[in-house]
């Protein structure tokens, strides 16, 4: 049995009556004519012919730095050099818990806006690899 069935959707190429089957949080099928009569699901949504598009993808993100505006202070010049200096000031103050919390918050916000794939970069210049461990924990939870 499916967790979710979205039916009666329209694809960007104009195809109509499209159904999307979701099981265990993953899309398992996208096909024409997939309806509640043909597939049982715990929850069904009628798209009423509305447009169904692929999710947004962020191919370049620094999740270890997300939601850190103002930490330890605002980048007054807005320059890359000051940003790098600020990151150097912030790194000794970072905790794994704070990194995980901010990254998970960002992931929730991203999904709510239709962003379902994020390719992140991470600071590996810290001998502790704190940010790497934090983002591996985020990956495990998400």
Feature map (PLM): residue ranges:
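N-terminal metal-binding scaffold of metallo-dependent hydrolase/deaminase domains
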Residues: 1-39
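Divalent metal-coordination and catalytic microenvironments
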Residues: 9, 25, 49, 60, ...
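Conserved residues at the C-terminal ends of beta-strands
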Residues: 12, 69, 121
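Active-site loop-helix segments enriched in His/Asp/Glu that coordinate
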Residues: 91-142
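Single, functionally critical "micro-switch" positions that shape active/binding sites
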Residues: 57-61, 89, 113
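Active-site gating loops and adjacent loop-to-helix segments of metal-dependent hydrolytic enzymes
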Residues: 66-99
